[in-house]
């Protein structure tokens, strides 16, 4: 990611912007709907001047009323989409997720739409392609199986804490020294699980024999499991279940997760150079291509306008004299760090 700071409300800045667009393959924006039309860069302009371009616009709600055109915020969209109503303990207040999940997935959807459009561009060559994503649609999309259950059954979704509406046991349980997550996905797994914790008769009991009945008798069964697991520590049960391929995980803190051997072996923590000469640690990309992850020398989040000079002199062949004049007039900000 590189930063160009440009005042394109000015005549000179607008001219620079249009030149950059014409030399681009993809243009992504997060302006309010209608912004491009307002500044004169309509769909007709893009189709006439930039037939090779794929565009992507990210907004809060799209351009359809009643809320189209309003700004969007992750916290508010978690509330409006229903996500808060299905997050938290059964009798607790609506709760947001621990990360800005709507923001994050909207960005991922933007990337997916751009990649799909680039493939389509092989066939559609006579006009630019516009893709659009918004936070509201992403929030609704994230309801996933909860939305399906509601649409098919007509029943209002409930909060299950760490549980699952359709699978039991699927929850956190306390051990002697910490919490462990258990996800028993079918009746055969439950038979093995019951035997491992010392209660093989559970799998023969009609109240627990099938997942359907385990869901009905959820509270009773979870209490029994809790009593059994509290007799030993988390790592003990983790090894017992892991050896028999029962899905489970020890609940870690963020610090524990970032320092875990698997995280480090997967190269998920990276030293990033800072523009001011220092280094800081950050999470690496989760994607590998041909076993290679990310850049050899990853870029830090840029200073504002840090790459203005690089972009304009290389992409537009702007002279140093022109660049300095635009900086003096406030059209461009030169954010290069000067030691």
Where are these regions (language model features)?
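Aromatic-enriched alpha-helical interface/lid elements that frame and gate functional surfaces
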Residues: 168-244, 248
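Conserved PLP cofactor-binding pocket of PLP-dependent enzymes
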Residues: 242-266, 271
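Flexible, small-/acidic-enriched active-site or ligand-binding loops
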Residues: 274-325
């Amino acid at each position: 990611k590189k930063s160009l700071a440009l005042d394109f409300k000015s005549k000179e800045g607008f001219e620079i912007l249009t030149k950059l667009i014409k030399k681009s393959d993809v243009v992504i924006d997060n302006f309010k709907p209608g912004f491009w039309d307002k500044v004169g860069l309509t769909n007709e302009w893009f189709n006439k001047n930039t037939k090779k371009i794929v565009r992507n616009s990210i907004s809060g709600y799209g351009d359809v009323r009643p809320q189209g055109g309003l700004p969007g915020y992750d916290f508010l969209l978690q509330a409006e989409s229903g996500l808060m109503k299905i997050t938290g303990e059964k009798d607790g207040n609506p709760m947001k997720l621990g990360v800005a999940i709507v923001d994050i997935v909207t960005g991922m959807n933007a990337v997916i739409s751009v990649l799909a459009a680039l493939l389509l561009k092989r066939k559609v060559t006579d006009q630019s392609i516009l893709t659009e994503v918004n936070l509201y649609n992403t929030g609704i999309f994230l309801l996933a199986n909860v939305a399906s259950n509601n649409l098919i059954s007509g029943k209002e979704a409930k909060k299950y804490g760490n549980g699952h509406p359709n699978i039991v046991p699927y929850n956190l349980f306390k051990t002697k020294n910490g919490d462990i997550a258990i996800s028993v996905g079918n009746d055969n797994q439950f038979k093995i699980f019951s035997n491992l914790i010392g209660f093989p008769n559970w799998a023969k009991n009609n109240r627990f024999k099938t997942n359907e009945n385990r869901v009905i008798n959820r509270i009773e069964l979870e209490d029994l499991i809790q009593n059994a697991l509290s007799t030993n520590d988390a790592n003990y049960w983790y090894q017992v279940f892991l050896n028999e391929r029962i899905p489970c995980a020890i609940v870690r803190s963020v610090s524990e997760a970032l320092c875990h051997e698997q995280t480090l072996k997967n190269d998920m923590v990276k030293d990033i150079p800072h523009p001011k000469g220092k280094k800081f640690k950050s999470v690496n990309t989760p994607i590998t291509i041909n076993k290679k992850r990310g850049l050899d020398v990853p870029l830090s989040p840029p200073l504002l306008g840090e790459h203005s000079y690089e972009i304009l002199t290389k992409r537009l062949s702007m002279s140093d004299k022109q660049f300095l004049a635009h900086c003096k007039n406030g059209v461009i900000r030169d954010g290069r760090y000067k030691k």
